[in-house]
Amino acid sequence: ENARACREAVQGSKRSREAQAGETSPAQSLAAWHEFAGQYFPALVDRPAVVHGGGVLLPVPFPQTNLHVLRAGVFVGSVQKGRFVPEHHLFTAFGAQCANCEQLTLADPRTTEYLSGREVEARTAADGWCCVTVDGWPLGGGKVSGGRVKNHYPKALRLL
């Protein structure tokens, strides 16, 4: 059942990326990514990025073999309504490099709240996008506004 929910979430996000692909040029997508990365992920600004399927991908060098590669890189986000919107993959892969983090602990009740898809109080992150970490490990992302972390944890992964 969880596998089905994950497939549906991936297919749904793929459909939304494909629908938005015609709205933004690759150059605009890369410019939006570089602006976003400069603010929240400065260590990633100089990494090569490519636009694929309406989204921005940070490719990983991979040797040419006969292996079928599902994803040779990290899908970091896409441009929606003129703004760069980060994906969950960005925060889980590069969360340790995020300049704005909401730090939780395993014993913190906000951890369960976040994993359940609810907003949590922001204690360590400033306004804007942030990586939510638990004991230093990246869990996902959110957007801080008015002292609250607006939850962007994927619905298919949430606790019920």
Identify the function of each model-found stretch.
Residues 3-160:
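Polybasic, low-complexity RNA-engagement segments
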